[in-house]
């Protein structure tokens, strides 16, 4: 995260720079990449989702659909608050392989570029130690396992991993 400042102030109706990006080294195997975002900023309660900071995905990423660990919105399209996301290289809904080329590392591009602090959030809504934790899961692209293909296996394994992050 090249723009993240851990001392950023959460001011209602503003954006905070936060730009998670995943890379693999030039000698790495081709891989599927997943990111889980855990948003532990706002207390549970009435209208908690409307008060929860959210982000909008960039083009190389898609939400994972899953009742337990899937991407969650605040009720508005493309305003994500948490969950599992997959690298798609710009093809919505289709897992893509991240592969180093020309003896150089490869990067996914930012999952999102900013986090928006809703205008309705105030200091009484925030937990004592607010945090938005972004974790990455990288899975070798040649591992089919018991699934129909490597992409399906990567997704199944990422969902199991995400359960431990939630």
Report each predicted region and the residues it spans.
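Beta-sheet-dominated interaction scaffolds and their linkers
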Residues: 1-17
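Cationic, hydrophobic amphipathic alpha-helical membrane-interacting segments
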Residues: 9, 26, 33, 70-71
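C-terminal, structured domain-capping segment
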Residues: 14-33, 90-166
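Short glycine-rich beta-strand segments
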Residues: 25, 38-42, 60, 137-139
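Short acidic, flexible loop segments centered on an aromatic residue
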Residues: 30-44
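A surface/secretory-pathway sequence property marking extracellular, secreted
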Residues: 41-88
